[in-house]
Regions:
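Conserved ABC ATPase "signature" C-loop
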Residues: 207-208
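Conserved signature/switch motifs of ABC ATPase nucleotide-binding domains
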Residues: 145-146
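Non-catalytic connector elements of ABC transporters
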Residues: 246-355
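Conserved ABC nucleotide-binding domain
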Residues: 102, 106, 112-130
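A short, flexible loop at the N-terminus of ABC-type nucleotide-binding domains that lies
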Residues: 1-4, 8-20
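Conserved ABC transporter NBD signature motif
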Residues: 56-68
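The feature captures the beta-strand-to-loop junction immediately N-terminal to the Walker
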Residues: 34-36
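Helix-to-loop junction immediately C-terminal to a conserved catalytic motif
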Residues: 49
Length: 355
């Protein structure tokens, strides 16, 4: 079990990568770090691995993880290959410095190469490999020796779309197998589909901040902020409205005068927001398409299981093609966010999620 106790990272020039984090990662758990470039994913992995200094404590089974280097394997984003050495040398080197004998090294190197499908390239220089095989060479290190924690940094980054898909289909089952053996797996990715496919929990990151930690279901149903919601639904809708109590229930009045019934949130909103401007947010598949505020559909196209209807800056998911569509949320589907920092103003989320 890994325990993060008040862990954060601040550089000498003052930039803080993420605020103090408390988190427990259980044996056999797969955790995805999801975020765009410069969101702090790599720094998070390096802090956990102990290869960069940080504030707070990173403990593994009660002891500092940095003092257990043999328990951790990290596949870096830059792959850290010896470009002018053979693939064989790249795999043999970490075993050699740990004192393995020649026969043992040969056996493990060839077995690891076979696992990832680069046996035919073992004696080529690493720089001669194409992009996807360089990634496979780096991944092969996971099969060289036993470990308890695997840290994998954005392994499909820089590949063409089809190559990235192919590589992930090869890597994902291996990571799942490691987890079934009780190993902890933490991987970074920019691709929400990769995160969703195998992660037990997801850490949503953005611009050096951790926006939310939770299961996919938790994040979709109760996003801590608009960014966390948009991480899985790029068309997540939000608009400014004035929050008030009317007719004995919670209501939000939009800037164009329409009222959104928020009775499902009665008693759940931080009280200081009553009478204030807020953001009302809802998922792109939660529009009341037959509702009273209609907009003309400018474009429509069929996706995998629905139509995507474009109305101005809105993209509405709908079961059928229409000429006009409602642009307010379905009853019971709207959530509320601060209109300045975009954080949730629902009291249970605010209380549960404090970084």
């Amino acid at each position: 079990m890994i325990k993060l106790d008040g862990v954060s990272k601040q550089y000498i020039y003052g930039a803080r990568v993420f605020a103090p984090v408390d988190m427990t990662i259980n044996d056999g758990e797969i955790v995805a770090l999801l975020g765009d470039e410069l969101s702090g994913k790599t720094t998070f992995l390096k802090v956990v691995a102990g290869v960069t200094d940080s504030e707070g404590k990173v403990l593994f089974d009660g002891e500092p993880l940095a003092k257990k280097p043999d328990d951790v394997i990290m596949i870096f984003d830059d792959l850290a290959l010896f470009a002018n050495r053979s693939c064989y040398y790249n795999l043999a080197y970490p075993l050699k410095i740990r004192g393995a004998n020649k026969d043992e090294i040969d056996k493990r190197v060839k077995a690891a190469a076979e696992k990832v499908g680069i046996t035919a390239s073992l004696y080529f220089k690493a720089r001669k490999l194409d992009s996807i095989d360089k990634k496979r060479l780096a991944i092969a290190r996971l099969f060289l020796r036993d470990f308890k924690v695997a840290l994998v940094d954005d392994i499909t980054r820089g590949l063409k779309k089809e190559d990235a898909k192919t590589l992930w289909q090869e890597v994902a089952p291996a990571l799942q197998d490691f987890a079934k053996e009780g190993k902890i797996v933490i991987f970074a990715t920019r691709d929400k589909d990769e995160a969703i496919s195998i992660a037990d929990r997801i850490v949503v990151t953005h611009y050096r901040q951790i926006k939310q930690i939770g299961t996919l279901e938790q994040i979709l149903q109760n996003p801590s902020n608009i960014w966390a919601a948009q991480a899985f639904d790029e068309d997540y809708a939000f608009e400014k409205a004035r929050l008030k109590i009317a007719y004995g229930k919670l209501v939000a009045t939009t800037e164009d005068g329409f009222e959104i019934d928020l009775s499902h949130l009665d008693g759940k909103v931080v009280k200081s927001y009553i009478g204030q401007d807020v953001y009302v947010g809802w998922a792109s598949d939660c529009y009341d398409v037959s509702g009273e505020r209609k907009a003309k559909v400018e474009h429509a196209y069929k996706s995998e299981n629905c139509y995507i209807l474009t109305c101005g800056n809105r993209r509405v998911k709908c079961g059928e093609k229409q000429d006009e569509v409602g642009t307010l949320p379905l009853l019971g589907k709207a959530l509320l966010f601060d209109d300045t920092n975009e954080n949730s103003i629902l009291s249970d989320i605010v209380a549960a999620y404090l970084f």
